Amino acid sequence: MIIAPSVLTADLADLGNACSEAVKSGLNWLHLDVMDGNFVPNLTFGPPVIAKLRKALGEEPIFDAHLMVMNAEESFQQYVDAGCNHISVHAEAVKHLHRCVTAIRDAGASAGVVLNPGTPVEAALEVLPEIDLVLIMSVNPGFGGQSFIPNVETKIRKLKQAIDQQVADGGRPVQIQVDGGVKAHNIAMLRDWGVSNCVVGS
């Protein structure tokens, strides 16, 4: 299982050093929570900060950008150019999801779809052959420190079944990532459900 620390847990005044220490410890998949103050109430960082972080850390770390922004189809290229390897967009915030994830992959990044707790899994299933990752939010996005929502189990299991069938039919494998309330006491449970990537610290 991939453990992806959320960079928002770091002191943003010392972000480069904090991320460097994470990478040195073997945690080279870094989760970047990008918030625009519109899709979610909070505001974090954008492409200029990410580009500086990439320059400081080099090419080794995987930058996994979770775009909590409106109209991500109009801005994702900036994050690819800044050095992000993975770009995940919210199904609720993109007008043409299939077109958006296809454009992300055409730009050279892996594409992901994010599902809020209240968003049905079918939103991701519609584009499953075109994506590399589904990020299931197990808290409501935009704020840290929330408790894990356990009823995401049904969504995860349904998604895992669809991915397994897609692979059996010769299609692409798709990672299941979970973000929100992931702790030592529930990470084994998530793995048993079929999760392959956990964001921690959010």
What are these language model-derived features?
Residues V101-A103, T119:
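Predominantly soluble domains enriched in secretory-pathway, periplasmic, or organellar proteins
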Residues V34, A91, L115-P117, S138-V139, ...:
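Short secondary-structure boundary segments
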Residues Q165-A168, P173-S202:
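C-terminal alpha-helical cap/extension of soluble enzyme domains
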Residues M1-S88, E92-H96, A103-A111, A124-I131, ...:
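Conserved N-terminal beta1-alpha1 strand-loop-helix module at the mouth
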